[in-house]
Regions:
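Short, acidic loop-to-helix structural element flanking the phosphoryl-transfer center
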Residues: 102-103, 137-168
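Short, surface-exposed acidic
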Residues: 70-86, 114-130, 190-196, 225
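Residues at alpha-helix caps and immediate loop-helix transition turns in enzyme cores, especially N-
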Residues: 54-57, 61, 149, 179-182, ...
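A metal-dependent, Asp-based hydrolase signature
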Residues: 86-136
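A ubiquitous short alpha-helical element
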Residues: 48-54, 93-97, 166-168
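Active-site neighborhood of HAD-like aspartate-dependent phosphohydrolases
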Residues: 18-21, 25-85
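Asp-based, Mg2+/Mn2+-dependent phosphohydrolase catalytic module
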Residues: 1-41, 158-161, 170, 174-175, ...
């Protein structure tokens, strides 16, 4: 007998008593089949946990970085910024062979050296950019970038923690570690209970490549069906090709692949409903 069934109603019959069980729910079905239990929730950062004018931040960051590169390499700032832009486009588009296992940071550094003639791995040069990320960039948040915690973000993290689930930050890894940790600070996320934060140095692909997601799950010892991704980007926050990771969508629009849709405040307030949607989606796939 299914031990999850509750509220039995007993009806008298001509001979003895009969027990009437309620119809099994979607969750009852998946528990009977052997639930693939949700173990972790992984979040995007920009416009998910962090409200930010991302275009303004990117422009500010890479304008400063390209100026530093130009000064170091004694090149024009305009030309250096253009070359750096093509490198970043290639990085984000994952334009490299499937057998290229360099980290995103190694790809970035080697392409800067090849196209701009500047060795970013040189200890003195590396230290200069690390200093910028950690000591200068934190003061760049202004009325234009306007970075702050997304309403509902901290409550969402608390809901995940209260549910006993693991948590990680799966932000697009097109920045070095220091430039990821900086906006985390703007959103008061530095002390969040993330087991893992993705950045250039610990990834080999960018979103939405499924390789990016699967590599990080391997580090965490998780399977795709044990994880819920939370993000706002209808392209980047849905692994391509589909690898079995479900996504709760907190952006604009109605992506057909979304397991659940709403705001971060909705996510925090209705987290039980989010979990139920996760299992309903899972059993629907099992039964299809």
């Amino acid at each position: 007998m299914n031990t999850r069934l509750r509220n039995l109603t007993i009806t008298s019959q001509a001979f003895g008593f009969g027990v009437k069980y309620p119809e099994p729910t979607t969750l009852d079905q998946i528990y009977e089949k052997g639930a693939r239990v949700l173990k972790a929730v992984v979040f995007d950062m920009d416009e998910t946990l962090l409200s930010i004018n991302l275009n303004a931040f990117i422009l500010r960051y890479f304008k400063d970085v390209s100026s530093m590169l130009a000064d170091i390499g004694h090149r024009s700032r305009g030309g250096t910024m253009a070359r750096l832009g093509t490198i970043l486009v290639d990085l984000n588009a994952n334009r490299r062979s499937g057998t290229d296992n360099r980290t995103n940071l190694e790809f970035y550094q080697e392409e800067v050296e090849r196209r701009c003639g500047i060795c970013l791995s040189d200890p003195l040069i590396y230290e200069a950019f690390t200093y910028y990320d950690r000591e200068v960039l934190p003061y760049k948040n202004d009325d234009v970038i306007n970075a702050h915690a997304m309403p509902g973000a901290h409550a969402a993290l608390q809901a995940v923690q209260d549910a006993g689930l693991r948590c990680a930050l799966f932000t697009n890894p097109s920045f070095p570690q220091g430039a990821i940790e900086c906006p985390m600070g703007w959103g008061d996320l530095a002390d969040a209970p993330f087991e893992l934060v993705t950045h250039m140095g610990n990834t080999t692909r960018c979103k939405p490549d499924a390789t990016y997601y699967l590599e990080q799950l391997q580090v965490m010892g998780l399977e795709p069906h044990e994880v819920l991704m939370v993000g706002n980007d209808p392209k980047r926050d849905f692994p391509s090709p589909d690898c079995g990771i479900q996504t709760a969508f907190v952006g604009q629009g109605k992506p057909s692949r979304a397991t659940w849709r709403g705001t971060m405040e909705d996510f925090a307030r209705d987290f039980d409903a989010v979990i139920e949607a996760f299992y309903e989606h899972q059993v629907a796939n099992e039964l299809s």
